[in-house]
Amino acid sequence: MTQNHNIPTAIQIQNPINNNVSVTISDQLPKPSANNPNLLSVDTRPTHRKGHHHKHSLSHQYFLPPKNRQPLEIPASYPIPTFKETFAILTFPQKLKLTSSILFFLVAVGVLLSGDATILLTLSCSLIVEGVLIIINVWRETLDSFLVWRHTCLRYPFGMQQMELLVDFSFSILLIFLGMNLLKEPAEHAIEDWGNLHHAGDHEEETVHIHLTISLFASAIISGFALLLDHPSAHIRELNSRFFHGLTLVPSLILVLLLSLGYQVGSFLSHLLSLTIAVTALVNGFSIAKSLALMLLLTYSNKEKVFECVSLIKEDTRIDQLNYAAIWQPHYNTCIANIGLTVSGGEREQAAVREDIIRIIQKTVGSIFGAGVQPKWEISVDIQRA
């Protein structure tokens, strides 16, 4: 007796996770062959789910381990040189400059003790300023050889060269007080002369001694040699030692020339030269202090150029909005410009806008220093698509 069994023509397996996904085994599959009787082919469809649903599957690992990242290119810090290390790398010309600074101090004392004229006090102060400037320049050149001075690190983003700004700012304040003190001396002498007009003939001319001529000649000689041997630096900085060497050299040569011709250094000429040096030191110190204060406050010195640069950027019709614009100067040789824009164009238009903005910055605020050595500009343009 033959029993009829209902053989299913297809087996449909319902996915317990998604009811819409099923796997069907049809009776239209190829028949198993004699060589491989147990072969069973499964129809693979795009909706077929591969893998498994165990708890250790990658799809269930919500907290994956972090990817291997390269170490930071910027180090945390550089070793700070000690005084012994700084003195060990001094070259022979630098040691010679330090020795000449001591000579400046000795000549300043000799000029001050050689007479009572006001110009002698002024020249002695000017010689002291030259000696201090020589020490600062040697210190600056020596520290420039270390990595921590100009290289960027996390502890010092712009290097330790920003100490240079603090030292120069302190020196400019010293120049201001020195100029005010030198202005006070001729004013006091003028008031005394006006109060004692009937004794003016007794103090019209000051006695000239041989050591006065020697002191003035020595100050002229060392200032002249310092002016000739002082090469201009390749870096931009506010304090120019050549200017101060010339400020001492010119009055010394004038006084030596007058003394050699037989003229005595009268009070009028003494006060005139003293006032000239004092006013020059005061004006120069104030201008240096103002520009360095703006650098220390992380701003830019020329506001008109900054406004011109921002207005030129806003005039570009391709720019939808200027989000921010920050232009500042952290050091003599470094200027930073950060610009944020919103542009609706594609990648090519964004690249063209970025190049035009860099060109505008270099033509406006980047050219205020004139010819010669220019500061290094770090320009970043952040463009967002509208």
Curated annotation (Swiss-Prot):
- Does the record carry Repressor as a key word? no
Name any GO cellular component annotation: Golgi membrane
Q: Which residues cross the membrane?
A: 102-122, 128-148, 163-183, 208-228, 243-263, 268-288
Q: Is Nucleus there in the keyword field?
A: yes
Give the knockout phenotype: Leads to sensitivity to camptothecin and DNA-damaging agents.
Give the top-rank taxon of the lineage listed in the UniProt record for this protein. Eukaryota
Coiled-coil annotated spans: none
Keywords per UniProt: Cytoplasm, Ion transport, Membrane, Nucleus, Transmembrane, Transmembrane helix, Transport, Zinc, Zinc transport
Where is it located?
Cytoplasm; Nucleus membrane
- Single Gene Ontology BP term? zinc ion import into Golgi lumen
Annotated InterPro entries: Cation_efflux
Membrane topology annotation:
Multi-pass membrane protein
Q: Which cysteines are joined by disulfide bonds?
A: none
Q: State how it assembles.
A: Interacts with cis4.
Instruction: Provide the function of this protein.
Output: Probable transporter involved in the regulation of zinc homeostasis.
UniProt lists the family membership as follows: Belongs to the cation diffusion facilitator (CDF) transporter (TC 2.A.4) family. SLC30A subfamily.
Name of the protein: Probable zinc transporter zrg17
Q: What is the scientific name of the source organism?
A: Schizosaccharomyces pombe (strain 972 / ATCC 24843)
Q: Which gene encodes it?
A: zrg17
